Amino acid sequence: CSGFWYFDCDENSEIVNANWSHEFRKMLGYHDTLDFPNKLESWSDLLHPQDKERVMVQLQAAIKDKTNQIKYQVEYRMRMKDNQYQWFRASAEVIRRLDGSASRIAGIFINIDAEKKEIMQAQKSAAFHRAFTKADLCEYYVNLEANTFDTFKVEPSLMTVFEQSHTWDE
């Protein structure tokens, strides 16, 4: 899923108007301008607290860069209408006046939640594997007669502890 958005900027490159497409609102679980108004805060207030500053700094850097060398391409989490967070990727281009000031920034918004969760699960599995092998929390069984090799035998109670431990956001 993807949605379109744009911001109009004044002569000082300050955002004065925001516009969100119907698809953009729908991806977040909203319906129209009544429950998701065309305001910057409608979007920025839903950014995950750990992502908000980074996202806003990147947006301002892209808007203020009169050379267009700084691109707005960022991944972040947003709170959906159901209060769950999902991952999104935003990419935009800045349209400039002759003096280089931003006139409009227009972009696309893509839901990458499934992709991010798949990557995080792979990282989690790799981390568990490293923890098991480096901490000798597993056993290796080689049966030469049957030509078999079993790599893990972790106590169920220990596996539960590892599965319940979280060292990063999911």
Model-derived features with residue positions:
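PAS-family sensory domain signal
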Residues: 1-43, 127-170
